[in-house]
Swiss-Prot record:
Keyword Nuclease listed: no
Protein name as annotated: Putative membrane protein insertion efficiency factor
NCBIfam families associated with the record: membrane protein insertion efficiency factor YidD (TIGR00278)
Keyword Cell division attributed: no
Bilayer topology annotation: Peripheral membrane protein
Family per similarity comment: Belongs to the UPF0161 family.
């Protein structure tokens, strides 16, 4: 089931998609992680929204460098801190 995303989320996801289609093919595969940083960014924004998703993506991109071995690094799940269920 497709969920509705905010305008900001759609813009950010669109920018990442443009990067994937136009820039990434020119520079080649460089990401050390699975999923790639751009896929991670899309998943993070869809899961956590624009603010937290952007923050998670920036942290991930800063980890993606030659001195980090990389590997499997999924988007953390959204934790529901709803106190009404207690």
């Amino acid at each position: 089931m497709e969920t509705s995303h905010s305008f900001g989320a759609k813009v950010l996801i669109g920018a990442i998609r443009i990067y994937q289609l136009m820039i990434s093919p020119l520079i080649g595969p460089r990401c050390r992680f699975v999923p790639t940083c751009s896929c991670y960014g899309i998943q993070a924004v869809k899961t956590h929204g624009v603010v937290k998703g952007s923050w998670l993506t920036v942290k991930r991109i800063l980890k993606c460098h030659p001195f980090n071995v990389g590997g499997y690094d999924p988007v953390p799940p959204k934790i529901n801190n709803n106190k009404e269920n207690e």
